[in-house]
Amino acid sequence: VAGTQVKHYRDLAFMGFWEVITNLRTILRNIDFCKKDITQFNPDVLIFIDYPGFNMRIAQWAKQQHIPTHYYISPQIWAWKENRIKAIKRDVDFMYVILPFEKDFYEREHQYRVHFVGHPLLDAIAQRKEVDEQTFKKENNLDVRPIIALLPGSRKQEIAKMLKIMLSIVDDFHQYQFVIAGAPSIDYHFYKRFIKEENVHFVSGKTYDLLSVSYAALVTSGTATLETALLNVPEVVCYKGNWISYHIAKRIIKLKYISLVNLIMDKPVVTELIQGDLTKKNLEAELNKLTTYRHRYEVFKDYVLLRERLGGEGASEKTASLILRQCQEN
């Protein structure tokens, strides 16, 4: 049946070198389960969406079974393990990329044709309902002060590490109220043990609504950094990972920036505080910058250019149309 969820991707998601190693048995078991399920379903084509560590293994197997393969949201081989291009050329028949620089990367550097379809976040944000700031504050028991949104991530180990440092600066910003954006899959009781200040509030499943009425945000690196920018909120990007994973990554990942905002713009539009730089002192200084008119004006100008570079809306529809056309032609 179309649209049937066999297993949620959250059950399969492990990030970081150490985390993958310690969960290797579970990962291999899920790969075997996926192959059996695909064989039973017997699809005409196979469409992969993101999640390269898992999907590229399945893509290799699928090609051996002579199943046409389409990949939406490319593996980030421009960041690390560029040699994966060999597997992509071999196992992926059609690639649909969502970042503007990816098209040049694939076609100019590796002579592999891809389709740039725009970024699906543009649709997600455009389709959301407008939120009235006063109503949002009233419904969530907030006062009239400007909001600083805290986005500590989506996984427990990540949240625990990021919230500790984010909340350390609350007492120095009494003129603002801090609101944590809870991950939908994690209940309030997990967050509660970190909240000791009266000036800290919590909402769950309302991240876009929260950002749309926020004055500034502290955001854990990842897709949330781009979401925050597209909702026009000045931000500080934060990251502090497992010590082993971080130092391994530092040696093999060749990027000037970790946030999608800066990568797309190819300049430091938003400040990134990474690992040892993510301290209370630095976080306070950067948040103070976000409250100044001149700094905010420059950020907003760059956000306009960012949106233009991402192309128009309709990324998923364009991808679906391209896949359908390929199916009809073959």
Specify the residue positions occupied by each region the protein language model found.
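Nucleotide-activated sugar donor-binding and catalytic core shared by glycosyltransferases
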Residues: V1-N330
